[in-house]
């Protein structure tokens, strides 16, 4: 409870800066990217970022991170990258016309993106209820849906301009999950999946085969779970753990 009070107190302090940003012109050639609360260089944001770097020279793609290891690694690869709370990181968040995230606005610096076109690329398909469709989620509480929405816009997670969808079958659910109009859902598919349709294949499989020769490689790809409580999802007992 105390940490939440501190968090919202900080949001109140930043409110003037949140609205002052609207007076600063955006640069449509600056696109800012981030992923997983700034801690990873991965997922849909990374693949779209790399695509922009390779095929859109007119766009200045900038990666924002909270992780110094990513900062060093990205710069070695020639990717323009800044720490979330560095002066340049803040400045480019303010100036960017387009912001791309893969989980939440905290993937970049959520305090300095007011007035930008914010696109949530998301990180999967809603096979289970997420966001506003999940009646047990705190986002459906009175405090979040009324107080946070109107007084703490920095923290509010349902003011994206667009979200992406993997297919038409998921688009309606993405709209209701993020409280958006259907027209704000872009059926683009996952940028991270484009590699499966590309002539240039990802080298990850080749590296695994080299590391584990004469082995059968099985991918285990579970869905994300909010609960921190360990759960045994293997409910059947007709398998041998040693063989696995």
Name what the model sees in each region.
Residues 16, 23, 27, 99-103, ...:
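Short secondary-structure junctions and interdomain/linker hinges
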Residues 42-50, 176-177, 191-244:
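Conserved catalytic-core segment of nucleotide-activated headgroup transferases in glycan assembly
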């Amino acid at each position: 409870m105390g940490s939440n009070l501190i968090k919202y107190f900080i949001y109140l302090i930043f409110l003037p800066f949140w609205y002052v940003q609207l007076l600063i012109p955006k640069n449509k050639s600056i696109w800012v990217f981030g992923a997983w609360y700034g801690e990873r260089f991965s997922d849909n944001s990374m693949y779209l970022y790399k695509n922009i770097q390779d095929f859109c020279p007119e766009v200045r793609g900038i990666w924002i991170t909270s992780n110094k290891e990513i900062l060093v690694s990205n710069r070695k690869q020639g990717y323009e990258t800044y720490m979330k709370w560095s002066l340049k990181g803040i400045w480019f968040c303010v100036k960017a016309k387009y912001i791309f995230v893969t989980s939440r606005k905290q993937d970049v610096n959520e305090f300095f993106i007011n007035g930008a076109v914010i696109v949530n690329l998301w990180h999967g398909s809603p096979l289970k209820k997420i966001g506003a469709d999940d009646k047990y989620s705190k986002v459906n509480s009175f405090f979040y849906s009324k107080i946070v929405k109107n007084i703490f816009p920095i923290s509010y997670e349902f003011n994206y301009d667009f979200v992406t969808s993997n297919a038409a079958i998921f688009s309606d659910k993405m709209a209701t999950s993020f409280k958006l109009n259907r027209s704000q859902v872009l059926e683009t598919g996952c940028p991270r999946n484009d590699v499966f349709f590309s002539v240039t294949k990802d080298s990850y499989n080749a590296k695994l085969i080299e590391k584990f020769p004469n082995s059968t490689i099985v991918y285990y790809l579970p869905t994300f779970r909010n609960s921190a409580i360990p759960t045994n999802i293997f409910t059947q007992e007709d398998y041998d753990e040693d063989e696995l």
